[in-house]
Every structure is written in C-alpha cells, then in structure tokens.
Amino acid sequence: MAREMRIVSVRELTGYIKERLESDPFLAHVWVRGEVSACTRHPSGHLYFFLKDEAARIRVVMFRSQVSRLGVPLENGTTVVVRGYLGVYERNGEYQLYAQGAEAEGAGKLHAALERLKEKLQREGLFDPARKRALPALPDTVGVVTSPVGAALKDILTIMRRRWPPARVLLAPVSVQGETAPYEIAQAIRALNGAGGVDVIIVGRGGGAPEELAAFNTEVVARAIFESRIPVVSAVGHEKDVTVADLVADWRAPTPSAAAEAVVPDQRAVRERLAAVESRLGRAVRHRLAVYRVRLEALRQRPVMASPGVLCRRRREVVRSLEERLGGAIGRRTGEGRSRLAVLSGRLEALSPLQVLARGYSICRRADGRIVRDADGVSPGERVIIWLHAGGLSCLVEETFPSRNP
C-alpha cells in the first residue's frame, strides 16, 4: 500500500530546519576560523560579511551591540576566529552565523594560555579575597603606574584635584602595551613600594582592545601586585574583560576615573561629616553642662550650703575629739610600755653576773681566759686572774684543795 504523501509549505520546511539547527547544542556555541570577505556595515550599525576558506563560505551577522565591543578590526582579507551560534534567516532560507565576538587568528591559544595562568595563580592563593586589604581613608600620597601621555593619567589627576586637593600624586611612568610593558609595570610597582610614604597605588590604562590589555594579563605583573606592601587598585578601563591584574589587586575599578574616586574621599562629603560631628559634639557638651548645672543647683539648695561655717565647726570639733582620743591612747600605751620595761629590766639585773660579784663572789680565770670551775682545773705554780665586784687580782697558785663547801 502506497504511503500517503505529506505536503508541507516552504515556511514549514524552513521552520523545521531552523528548529533542528538552533536546538543543536554543538551549534549553539562555536568558534569558526576563516577569511573575512564582502564585509559591509549597515546604517543601523550591524556588520555583514562572509567567512570563507578554500572549500566553503558562511554568511556572518554581527549586531551593533557586539560590533562596539570588537577587539580586532574586521577587514576583507584578514583571517579571524569568530565566536557565535548558528541560526536560520527564514526570509531568505539561509543559515548564517550570528557572531558574538571575533579575535585574531591564534587568539584561541592565547586564551587557553591565559586560562592556565589564572588556574595556576588561583591555586597559589593570589586571588584569595581574604588577603585583599582595605584602602586608606585619607591618603597623603597616591602612586600612579600608567603612561605619562595617556588619558588615564589626566582623568586621575582631574578627579583627585577636584575631590581631595591635599593628596600628592607620585607618577611612575611606564609603557602600558608592548613587549617591555609587563616588566616596566612590575618594576614601577616595586619602586613605589621602596619610595616610602606612598599610601596606595593605582595601576592601569585608559581602556583598549583585549589584545592591548595583554600586559595586565601577565604573571610578572600579577606577582608584583601580590608582593606589594601597599594596597593596589587596578584600573584597566575595560568593564567587559577582567584581567589577571584585576583579580590580584586589592580593589578593582572599571576606569581610571573610578579608581581615583575610590582612593580619595570627596572633600565636600568630608566637610559635611565634620560639620555633623561638630554639631553632635556641641549638643553633647551642652547637654552635659545642663546636667551639671542641675546637679550644682541641687547641691546649692542643700541647707549645709546655706551656712558652710556650721559644717566647718562640726568638722573641727570632730578633729579635736579625735586628737584628744589619740593623745590619751598614746599616753596609755607609753605608760604600759614603761612598766613592762621596768619589770624586764629588774629580771635582767637579777641575773647579771655583776650582782653575784657584789654579794662577795668572784670569778677565777686561767691565763688563757678560761673560767676555773674547780680546783682540778689549775695546777700549783700556775698564775690565775681573780675578778671581784670592783677590780681583779693576779694570783699565783701555791696549792690546790679538794672540792668542799666554803
């Protein structure tokens, strides 16, 4: 039995093809390399061109919003890598690439290398938010690392002079693009760290295409920012692309002007805050004085304050009474001490050897000073000294007698 023929319209067929193409995840995000040809810009700002190689070509559409962010010039004959998604333009029945960005050939490798660098620095902790430092509230000196002839420096100076005139600017002039730029920038950051007196550093440039920001995507600049003892503000001036310098810096500003606004206060706001503080302080002082005035008035109303002489007389009487009590206590203590001293002195006197000698006794010592306690302690012919109550005698022993009572 023959299958029933199904007839579809051109619109249905084109819609089916469109749905199949645009639902394919591979075609939703592709990178296509090719040579630009037939490039035209529509009055609306959209860009239309072909990407071709030796075997095929594809139509490309880039809308105005994407054209304004192009990092490379799209000119006939140049080879580029276009990023975008595939779609179908139903009116013409054509499939085409809707470009979301374009880079020079070889940019893919550069992008991969940049991602590897970011992963490496991330592992080492250079992007750690915990290590980022706060910016000083009132910097005296701001170091600036940028081109001396670029718009970035002019913007920074203009903003700082308007917002906070007392701040000094110490410029470390560098190239912001080119082969030597990364090393110049790193050296300038280290030089400002060694200069002394610099409170914060702004590192940046006045925007540019992605490839012109390459110096700020290098390891040497990242490590110089990380090693800086002074807080660093990155101001690359490119809001869409985040550079490695942005990730390492203590503060990221989208533009040099925004960096200047971040590092110095607005003098008008400071004056307003000071005026507010002065007003609050004045109110606090006046309130405190009012409280003390009330307390003083309450004290003045007390009866004692009406006749302070009465209080003084009472205090003098108390002092006089205390003096009398103290004098009596000292006298009693002194008398008791004298009595105890007399008793102890009598006891000591009774035990004194001099009192014993006064009763007719004597002390006999040998020539070497030892006391003779019995007759056996000396020999006939030996000389002894006999001490009396008054004076002494030097005697020669003629004879000794055995112990007996006198």
Swiss-Prot record:
Name of the featured protein: Exodeoxyribonuclease 7 large subunit
Top EC class for this record: hydrolase
Entry-linked InterPro entries: Exonuc_VII_L, Exonuc_VII_lsu_C, OB-fold_nuc-bd_dom
Catalytic activity reported: Exonucleolytic cleavage in either 5'- to 3'- or 3'- to 5'-direction to yield nucleoside 5'-phosphates
A UniProt-annotated Pfam family: Exonuc_VII_L
PANTHER family per UniProt: EXODEOXYRIBONUCLEASE 7 LARGE SUBUNIT
EC number: 3.1.11.6
Subunit structure: Heterooligomer composed of large and small subunits.
Record-stated family: Belongs to the XseA family.
NCBIfam families cross-referenced by the UniProt entry: xseA
GO molecular function, one term: nucleic acid binding
Main subcellular location: cytoplasm
Biological process terms in GO annotation: DNA catabolic process
Keyword DNA repair: no
Function, as annotated: Bidirectionally degrades single-stranded DNA into large acid-insoluble oligonucleotides, which are then degraded further into small acid-soluble oligonucleotides.
Record keywords: Cytoplasm, Exonuclease, Hydrolase, Nuclease
GO CC terms in record: cytoplasm; exodeoxyribonuclease VII complex
